[in-house]
């Protein structure tokens, strides 16, 4: 079984997978979440892949259609590289016209945003303190409008509230748009940038009254006309963690696999096919 997967060329098997996805999912719409996953294995291998005391490691970056609940494709991250170089390769290999591509903070790069725009798609990308200047600017923009009662043309807001499991959760999505000026504000480091998004999450424990809040920031090529759609897209991004990566870890026990090299890459594709069937 292991030998069977080891003799198949990963590029060929990936092509078969992509063609199969096209048959199952005729058209991709809505949110396409992109995220990387480290596959750890106990086996040692040669210098072709990253090794260490923990043994074989394989980074795969996957694209997940949140609406269709299916993996659209994946690429291997080269050992001497990272997700930043792998993500554009994956995006360029997919038909994403009209989709909203969501990525964590690793995707907050000029080349990645340019690739998404060139594929006729939009993006929502998390921004964190590893991009210090951009993060501080985004935070300042959102903080200026977060708690204002008045809504002016450049600001829209969507509020949702959920009660359950002994707590009340309130989420406020604030979208601030300066249109084409936004790109200049960020010194053209993010292609197609139109809006900054702030998600303020407030949680109250009913029994104790304990209150916590957190604000997360995003950059997007979408304008501020549909804040509810943006809030929904950000929540849908987590489906790649819950419905793909978690299943690979728990159901298929990917981290306990003894497969290496081609076998590991091919079996990763096979498990994603199995999740859809």
Question: What is each stretch, according to the model?
Answer:
Residues 1-47, 120:
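Active-site- or DNA-interface-adjacent structural scaffold in DNA-acting proteins
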Residues 1-18, 103-109, 116, 259, ...:
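Short, positively charged, Gly/Tyr-enriched micro-motifs
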Residues 51-99:
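Electropositive, glycine- and tryptophan-enriched low-complexity nucleic-acid-binding patches
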Residues 235-277:
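Basic, amphipathic alpha-helical segments enriched in Lys/Arg and hydrophobic/aromatic residues
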């Amino acid at each position: 079984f292991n030998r069977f997967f080891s003799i198949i060329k990963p590029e060929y098997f990936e092509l078969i997978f992509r063609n199969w996805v096209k048959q199952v999912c005729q058209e991709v719409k809505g949110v396409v979440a992109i995220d990387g996953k480290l596959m750890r294995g106990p086996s040692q291998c040669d210098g072709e892949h990253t090794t260490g005391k923990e043994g074989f490691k394989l980074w795969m970056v996957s694209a997940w259609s949140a609406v269709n609940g299916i993996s659209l494709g994946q690429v291997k991250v080269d050992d001497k590289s990272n997700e930043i170089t792998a993500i554009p390769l994956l995006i360029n290999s997919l038909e994403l016209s009209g989709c909203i591509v969501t990525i964590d903070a690793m995707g907050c790069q000029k080349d990645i945003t340019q690739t998404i725009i060139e594929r006729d798609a939009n993006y929502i990308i998390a921004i964190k303190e590893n991009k210090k200047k951009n993060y501080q600017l985004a935070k300042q923009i959102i903080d200026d409008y977060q708690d204002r009662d008045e809504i002016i043309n450049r600001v829209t807001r969507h509020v949702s509230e959920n009660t359950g499991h002994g707590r009340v959760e309130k989420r406020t999505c604030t979208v601030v748009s300066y249109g084409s000026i936004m790109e200049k504000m960020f010194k053209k480091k993010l292609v197609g940038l139109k809006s900054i998004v702030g998600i303020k999450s407030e949680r109250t424990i009913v029994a104790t009254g304990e209150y916590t809040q957190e604000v997360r920031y995003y950059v997007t090529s979408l304008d501020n006309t549909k804040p509810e759609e943006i809030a929904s897209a950000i929540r849908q991004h987590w489906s790649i963690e819950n419905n793909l990566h978690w299943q690979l870890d728990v159901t298929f026990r990917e981290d306990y696999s003894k497969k290496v090299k081609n076998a590991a890459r091919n079996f990763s594709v096979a498990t994603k096919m199995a999740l859809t069937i």
